[in-house]
């Protein structure tokens, strides 16, 4: 298969994919990879396969194609294509919740040589690295990466990247319970889709709507949350986007749980958990399990609650997510308090505070915790987070966290 035929087949596959003929598109791209003698064409076909398998939630296959793409890039001796392939490797590891590996590949990308095209990749690399750090509950590092990605998006006038970064920032602030910002950023993403996204994939609209739904739910605006989530789910079903379907089912279940309808919540949690397990999203599984545990807790079924929390803890520990571990310890406290097991209760109180220390989830001005209740946060240029009200009363005195870390102990 020569250069012209390779190009024609790739374009044919893209047209089929956009028309939701996914199976036919995958078959064509696979044939290009197997039969084409032209390395740039094979590289591009592998890129199409990577994107398609990512959107379907087939992350193991995505990673396999990313490895093949990196080998093709090395054969071509093209540093920019090597960077692109390494970015896809990073994304694959991130999707499989192998966050440290994802960070390592991102750092390799940022340290690689290349021309103007590599600079365009840097924004996407920073976004992937931020998502990986968020998966590890390294909030300051995640925010630093997201802000860098946003600067690249603005500098390159890359509205698609800006849209994706805004969604990640929405997820970031949902976790830290600044629900005003958690809603602001996906709303900004939705505005970008409305203003610039006429020719974009519908996944951008679906993604922004899902993150809006998550924020609305946290704000107690259940009707708005349901409406946004239904819109997102409709697109996810239409495009066979299994990862987004799992997230929407989780959101639907959370809405029903908030409305005290455990009978409707549990089947949706189970459906979400099945998809999360199928696609290999271990962190997603842990999130679902914690919320199932809350249902059993409401029903006063402590043995069931305990079993589910233990599974969530194991998954969170395996992927290195400290925030989910903290939430698990919090649930353990409630369970053991109900059971009257004082020693086990004390053990988990200690572990809870250890997680807080590890994540540095304290305001450096007032000393109170960050992320335990809905409150407005503000980041300084160094990406350290504080309560907004504390910064407003502190004045322009610089970052107390940075000042503390720069003071070195003297010799005694």
From Swiss-Prot:
Q: Which Gene3D superfamilies match?
A: Tetratricopeptide repeat domain, Zinc/RING finger domain, C3HC4 (zinc finger)
Q: Name one Pfam family in it.
A: Rapsyn_N
**Do the record's keywords include Phosphoprotein?**
yes
Task: List the GO biological process terms.
Answer: positive regulation of neuromuscular synaptic transmission; synaptic transmission, cholinergic
Primary site of residence = membrane
What InterPro entries does its record include? Postsynaptic (IPR001237), Postsynaptic_CS (IPR018293), RAPsyn (IPR052480), Rapsyn_myristoylation/link_N (IPR019568), TPR-like_helical_dom_sf (IPR011990), TPR_rpt (IPR019734), Znf_RING (IPR001841), Znf_RING/FYVE/PHD (IPR013083)
Per UniProt, the RING-type Zn-finger stretches lie at 363-403
Q: Which is one GO molecular function term here?
A: protein-membrane adaptor activity
Instruction: Quote the subcellular location field of this record.
Output: Cell membrane; Postsynaptic cell membrane; Cytoplasm, Cytoskeleton
For the modification Phosphotyrosine, which residues carry it? Answer: 196
Q: Spell out which residues are annotated as carrying Phosphoserine.
A: 405
Lipid bilayer topology: Peripheral membrane protein
Keywords from UniProt, A to Z, are:
Cell membrane, Cytoplasm, Cytoskeleton, Lipoprotein, Membrane, Metal-binding, Myristate, Phosphoprotein, Postsynaptic cell membrane, Repeat, Synapse, TPR repeat, Zinc, Zinc-finger
Is Phosphoprotein among the key words of this record? yes
Spans of the TPR repeats are 6-39, 83-116, 123-156, 163-196, 206-239, 246-279, 286-319
Q: Which GO terms describe its cellular component?
A: cytoplasm; cytoskeleton; neuromuscular junction; postsynaptic membrane
Protein task: Postsynaptic protein required for clustering of nicotinic acetylcholine receptors (nAChRs) at the neuromuscular junction. It may link the receptor to the underlying postsynaptic cytoskeleton, possibly by direct association with actin or spectrin.
Q: Say which family it is in.
A: Belongs to the RAPsyn family.
Description of its domains: A cysteine-rich region homologous to part of the regulatory domain of protein kinase C may be important in interactions of this protein with the lipid bilayer.
- Which named protein is this? 43 kDa receptor-associated protein of the synapse
Q: Which organism is it from?
A: Tetronarce californica
Gene name? RAPSN
